Amino acid sequence: MAAKHENPYAALKTLFHEPNRLAMMSALSQAIDGLTFNDLKRECGLTDGNLSRHLKTLEEAEAIRIEKTFVDAKPRTTVFLSDAGRKSFIEYLQALEEVLQKAARSVAAVEKKSASRRLPWGKLVKAGEG
């Protein structure tokens, strides 16, 4: 696992943080043989235009590789995660996990502190009264 960042938020790459691209990268990370354009579109629930736009962004960042072939005289576009894309996506997921764990700990601590200040019937005790 990569070293913990002093500021894990800095490692949250906007390239992957956009929900549709996060879904696309997640789907591609499970597909060793890549996914066809139509399979990726269906998997992520995107339109042709929306998928094309996000594919262009990911391809420009060298996170994916697009292969165009013909099968039975029909064009087929297959999308693969690049080695650099896989590495970068793993680093992003590790940073995201670190941020989420920190947030979960903070929420739990606040909930615990709030719970200790509640009266049995659920009312909060005002500061200085409890």
Question: Could you tell me what each predicted segment is?
Answer:
Residues 55-56:
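Short, hydrophobic-biased segments on the C-terminal half of alpha helices
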Residues 66:
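Short beta-strand "wing" residues that participate in macromolecule-binding interfaces
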Residues 7-50, 69-72, 76-80:
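N-terminal helix-turn-helix DNA-binding core of bacterial DNA-binding proteins
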Residues 2-7, 26, 87-130:
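Amphipathic alpha-helical dimerization/coiled-coil segments
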Residues 62:
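Glycine-centered, phosphate/nucleic-acid-interacting loop/turn motifs that mediate DNA/RNA or nucleotide
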Residues 71-92, 96:
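Basic, amphipathic "hinge/linker" alpha-helix immediately C-terminal to the N-terminal HTH DNA-binding motif
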